[in-house]
């Protein structure tokens, strides 16, 4: 049990770029206080990201596979927040060991045949807040959606936002992962899927630490931990290339590309792996996770360790990339 306390009072916040609707919204018996963001066309906002992170992390129990009530709380909040942006969502329900789990699938459509998928997992490993892993990724997807809904007419494809359950152990690399369930469900549409962008830990940066890498890569890439990484296989080369080009165009945060097959350790450490299995191009946007973040899978993975300004840079790069036609 998290002992941070539970404040049931109505809370009001007013970020610079975005008005916030704050309400007491009851989801069954488990969700008593919620904060909502109202859509407004603007660059990624650190204030919004903080609100999302606080709501995802929550005040009480941890959102691991044993605490289904917490997983339901988070998925219900995500669905309602996206609804307030004008993006309809549905649950993708499935059972594991007789228990019910669900992805949240949200669609921003504008009449195109092709689509791009943007996703992140919302569960955690064990008993910890999981601020970087992976509340940061979920917050990034939500903020991306907020911006894109205001620029819908500029999109050259539909966008499907997916929030996955059961990415963490003991389900990682099994067919019970939420991303495996989703990837399998869309395999017949793969010719219409331009690519999948997975946000996996996007909030930890430290220019003073010595960055670690999978074997053989430390001589090629920077020693500092102050960049965002675009991880892809050869099939997904164009996705990673375009994302880093977008980051370079914005010129706010360094972007490094990693291109390798799934058998190279570290390249497969998230939900993009399941799309590769079905021949769907996919990439991971990440701060490199356990290769950088000393708080990985520990109780010290908290909100105060995140760099919200650089998270916002990561989101702006993704928005820029999604508004630019993918170059093969």
Report residues per predicted region.
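N-terminal capping segment at the start of a domain
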Residues: 36-73, 85, 123, 292-301
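Active-site-adjacent substrate-binding region
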Residues: 195, 206-328
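Second-shell loop/turn segments in exported
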Residues: 39-43, 60-69, 94, 125-134, ...
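Bacterial N-terminal signal peptides that target proteins for export
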Residues: 8-23
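A non-catalytic alpha/beta surface segment that caps or lines the substrate-entry region
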Residues: 51-111, 258
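Extracytoplasmic/secreted proteins, especially bacterial periplasmic and envelope-associated proteins
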Residues: 48-55, 69, 73-84, 136, ...
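Acidic/histidine-rich catalytic neighborhood of metal-dependent amide-processing enzymes
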Residues: 125-239, 267
